[in-house]
């Protein structure tokens, strides 16, 4: 199934997975840039939220690209924690918590982390809609969904 065909299925979990990838990129890039700029102004709160955003980006990477759990040497407890986030509702909840944490960074100072918070919120909403509509979670084959791991191993 091509990427175009995946989007034509109108399954919100596919939309959520791709928005998750965009969220991961934004969390890492904006977290890094805000951390570097806040180091010079010594804004400890923004540095802390920037570090959290970068940690979230790595969590999202392992959640959205399941093939990495097979390739990367990780602990069994980390693998078990990531595998718990497998249903649409669990993913919606996880993204909701991550979005809330990043939105809280706006309390002290408004930074570009708002863009990451918006995308995390949209991702959580897509997974929530997929769960509410009763759509089964479908992993994108482009991102290492069903069948890709078996082809590599």
From Swiss-Prot:
The chain crosses the membrane at residues 12-32, 44-64, 89-109, 112-132. Glycans are attached at residue 11. It comes from the Eukaryota. It is found in: Golgi apparatus membrane. The keyword ATP-binding does not apply. Disulfide bonds: none annotated. GO terms for cellular component: Golgi membrane. The keyword Aminoacyl-tRNA synthetase does not apply. GO terms for biological process: vesicle-mediated transport. Golgi membrane protein involved in vesicular trafficking. It is a multi-pass membrane protein. Belongs to the TVP18 family. This is Golgi apparatus membrane protein TVP18. Keywords: Glycoprotein, Golgi apparatus, Membrane, Transmembrane, Transmembrane helix. PANTHER family: CALCIUM CHANNEL FLOWER HOMOLOG (PTHR13314:SF2).
